[in-house]
Swiss-Prot record:
Disulfide bonds: none
Domain of life (superkingdom): Bacteria
CDD domains named in the record: Ribosomal_L18_L5e (cd00432)
Organism for this UniProt entry: Methylobacterium sp. (strain 4-46)
Quaternary structure, from the entry: Part of the 50S ribosomal subunit; part of the 5S rRNA/L5/L18/L25 subcomplex. Contacts the 5S and 23S rRNAs.
Classification of source organism: Bacteria, Pseudomonadati, Pseudomonadota, Alphaproteobacteria, Hyphomicrobiales
Pfam families: Ribosomal_L18p
PANTHER family: 39S RIBOSOMAL PROTEIN L18, MITOCHONDRIAL, LARGE RIBOSOMAL SUBUNIT PROTEIN UL18M
GO terms classed as biological process: translation
Protein name, UniProt field: Large ribosomal subunit protein uL18
GO cellular component terms listed in the entry, alphabetical order: cytosolic large ribosomal subunit
């Protein structure tokens, strides 16, 4: 199991290094995916602040969602974070998939955030 975690950490570091080079001052849309929930934050790395955040545990979403671990939950979280980011004055971000494959829940969240008005 530790080998899997080590490989994930290496992938995550490689993705973040590439993002830092390509960011050009844009905030980072960072995704964390657990087995039961999905979380996303818009982070300004220059100041070290979180500008907007959403997760499948938000009270607004919890009542509507059957579970936080499917694509439907990721779609709702993506829409919600886009709405909150736009309210905070952020429209252009760089997508940090945190070493996860761009497939399934991560892809659904990214597509919903794009539909919500975020550009990346």
């Amino acid at each position: 199991m530790s080998r899997k975690i080590d490989l994930l950490d290496r992938r995550r570091a490689r993705v973040r290094r590439a993002l830092r080079a390509a960011a050009n001052g844009r905030p980072r849309l960072s995704v964390f995916r657990s087995s039961k929930q999905i979380y996303v934050q818009v982070i300004d790395d220059a100041s070290g602040r979180t500008l907007a955040a959403a997760s499948s545990l938000d009270k607004d979403l919890r009542a509507r969602l059957k579970t936080g671990a499917d694509k439907a939950a990721a779609l709702e979280v993506g829409k919600l974070v886009a709405e909150r980011a736009k309210a905070a004055g952020v429209t252009k971000v760089i997508f940090d998939r945190s070493g996860y494959l761009y497939h399934g829940r991560v892809k659904a969240l990214a597509d919903a955030a794009r539909e919500g008005g975020l550009e990346f």
